[in-house]
């Protein structure tokens, strides 16, 4: 591709887990017409194709394209309109959820679905169909997209809606990891709010059985947001004990008078950026156990506590580049969900993780609600768990066995987190994958949109 017409830089790219790096040509532009011409040129030249990349917070290889072209989207970041009456925002795909939150809050609007970080673009949120603490009440991000402009392989920009004439392409793009085309712009329906704060309740459980029982008693319906940190290191009976945080956006009259003076103030500071100095091996059982014990004891039980966005939702966003704490070898975030009825099988997986010798401190437990229409959307009703394993010998073999178990129990892995499962396993986990591939090939028969993940999982 001509570097005169399309000035690119050669970069080594990897996911947030800092594993499986590859080198690609990267084009960054704020002009959507340049993106259209670059994709058209890539289609004409063949080769390794092109993929869009947002802020690089996917943990695996879905936004990498070794030997090909990567469109760096964050420069395309205009907010075109915010309508507090209809609750609709019209934004470029490179707008981050952090940027959108700051712009929308003065209008009394809240991002409808937030993952564990705000450092995600709108395009990435759609492409991965991200979910958050409110999945049981609001579903995933794609549920709130009212339209999008999708650049397809032939250079056409198509206007897509969830129930329009091209609804199959809309839903194939939701969760499609950028492989149906490049999302240039989207309209999102936001959530109305009176404040930028939460009213939160905290609870602790003493064992895995207690944690599961707590999430099975129906009380989740009383809260908009819910998730838990759980102990994956201690032996039974402490294994699976949890610090559970649940809450809803605060009403104005629920705030103390001091906060009522500026209830929509964006209150989520970043304290520091971690330097890249941490040695491999520092993240281990002996550092994780005391941190976990401190976190569990500090959490405690509380009611009706007013918390800001950082306290309730995004503690890790206080630390820029926090993934550096795992050292240059990186880490694997393993996220899976199994159906609600597979509860005994789910418990056996947690026991096996504890016994494996691969230890994780940053563990998330969430009971998902219903999924949506997207063939490759990750959430299904069931037990969802995220664990962060430092990279070390034997990990690949262990998680390969976990893959087998998750599949056997009717579960699946999340493309935004995966960088190593096989095509055979992935295809078996997603029963509608043939439907998705048919739709993708109908708009991109030559595989112009391609990524390291797409080649690994045979999605082209």
UniProtKB/Swiss-Prot annotation:
InterPro entries, per the entry: ALO_C (IPR007173), FAD-bd_PCMH (IPR016166), FAD-bd_PCMH-like_sf (IPR036318), FAD-bd_PCMH_sub1 (IPR016167), FAD-bd_PCMH_sub2 (IPR016169), FAD_lactone_oxidase-like (IPR010031), Oxid_FAD_bind_N (IPR006094), Vanillyl_alc_oxidase_C-sub2 (IPR016171)
Superkingdom of the organism of origin: Bacteria
EC annotation from Swiss-Prot or TrEMBL: 1.1.98.3
Pathway: Cell wall biogenesis; cell wall polysaccharide biosynthesis
Binding site for FAD: 52-62, 116, 121-124, 128-131, 183, 414
Disulfide bonds, paired cysteine numbers: none
Enzyme class: oxidoreductase
Effect of loss of the gene: Disruption of this gene is only possible in the presence of a plasmid-encoded copy of the gene. Curing of this 'rescue' plasmid from the bacterial population results in a cessation of growth, demonstrating gene essentiality.
GO molecular function, one term: L-gulono-1,4-lactone dehydrogenase activity
Subunit field text: Monomer. Interacts with DprE2 to form an epimerase complex.
Identification of the protein by name: Decaprenylphosphoryl-beta-D-ribose oxidase
């Amino acid at each position: 591709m001509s570097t005169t017409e399309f000035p690119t830089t050669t970069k080594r790219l990897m996911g947030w887990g800092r594993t499986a790096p590859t080198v690609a040509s990267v084009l960054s532009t704020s002009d959507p017409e340049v993106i259209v011409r670059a994709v058209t040129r890539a289609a004409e030249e063949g080769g390794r194709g092109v993929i869009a990349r947002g802020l690089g917070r996917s943990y695996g290889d879905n936004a990498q394209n070794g030997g090909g072209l990567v469109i760096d989207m964050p420069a395309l970041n205009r907010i075109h309109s915010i309508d507090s009456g209809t609750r609709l925002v019209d934004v470029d795909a490179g707008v981050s959820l952090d940027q959108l939150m700051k712009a929308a809050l003065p209008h009394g609007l809240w991002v409808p679905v937030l993952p564990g970080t705000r450092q995600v673009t709108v395009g990435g949120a759609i492409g991965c169909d991200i979910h958050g603490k409110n999945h049981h009440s609001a579903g995933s991000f794609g549920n709130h997209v009212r339209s999008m402009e999708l650049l397809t392989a032939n250079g056409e920009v198509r206007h897509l809606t969830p129930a329009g004439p091209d609804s199959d392409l809309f839903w194939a793009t939701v969760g499609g990891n950028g492989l149906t085309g490049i999302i240039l712009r989207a309209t999102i329906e936001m959530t109305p709010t009176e404040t930028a704060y939460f009213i939160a309740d905290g609870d602790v459980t003493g064992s895995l059985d207690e944690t599961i029982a707590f999430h099975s008693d129906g009380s989740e319906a009383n809260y908009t947001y819910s998730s838990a940190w759980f102990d994956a290191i201690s032996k039974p009976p402490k294994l699976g004990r949890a610090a559970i945080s649940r809450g809803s956006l605060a009403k104005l009259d629920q705030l103390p008078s001091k906060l009522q003076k500026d209830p929509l103030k964006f209150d989520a500071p970043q304290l520091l950026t971690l330097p890249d100095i941490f040695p491999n091996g520092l993240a281990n059982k002996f550092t994780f156990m005391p941190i976990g014990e401190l976190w569990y004891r500090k959490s405690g039980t509380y009611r009706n506590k007013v918390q800001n966005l950082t306290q309730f939702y995004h503690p890790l966003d206080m630390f820029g580049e926090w993934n550096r704490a795992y050292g240059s070898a990186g880490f694997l975030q393993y996220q899976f969900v199994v159906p609600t009825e597979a509860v005994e099988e789910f418990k056996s997986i947690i026991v096996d993780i504890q016994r494996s010798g691969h230890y994780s401190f940053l563990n998330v437990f969430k009971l998902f609600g219903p999924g949506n229409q997207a063939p490759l959307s990750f959430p299904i009703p069931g037990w969802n768990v995220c664990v962060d394993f430092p990279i070390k010998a034997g990990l690949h073999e262990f998680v390969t066995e976990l893959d087998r178990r998750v599949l056997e129990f009717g579960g699946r892995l999340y493309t935004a987190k995966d960088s190593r499962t096989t095509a055979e396993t992935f295809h078996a986990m997603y029963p509608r994958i043939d439907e998705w591939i048919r739709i993708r090939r109908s708009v991109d028969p030559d595989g112009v949109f391609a990524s390291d993940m797409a080649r690994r999982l045979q999605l082209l």
